[in-house]
Curated annotation (Swiss-Prot):
It holds the Pfam family NDUF_B12. This is NADH dehydrogenase [ubiquinone] 1 beta subcomplex subunit 3. It is found in: Mitochondrion inner membrane. The chain crosses the membrane at residues 61-83. The keyword Translocase does not apply. Signal peptide: none annotated. It comes from the Eukaryota. The modification N6-succinyllysine is found at residue 23. The modification N-acetylalanine is found at residue 2. Coiled coil: none annotated. One of its GO terms (cellular component) is mitochondrial inner membrane.
Amino acid sequence: MAHGHGHEHGPSKMELPDYKQWKIEGTPLETVQEKLAARGLRDPWGRNEAWRYMGGFANNVSFVGALLKGFKWGFAAFVVAIGAEYYLESQKKDKKHH
């Protein structure tokens, strides 16, 4: 069997994001670094936590927001379920009367 025709079936190599894209400037981590620097210390892993303050992860989640997160889709599913139940019950009643 010939190999190397672009039809690999094994796991592909995962691409890791570039660590340089995460910056602590403008995040609460910057304050931590400044306080550590005042004591002559440095957090070499601070950049690893910067993703928490960027992009979609940066939004503050309120208690109400957490409770209502899936409400839209849940309510839509509820309406569909009630509609299906109503339809199936009406079909069952029609069969009993005939």
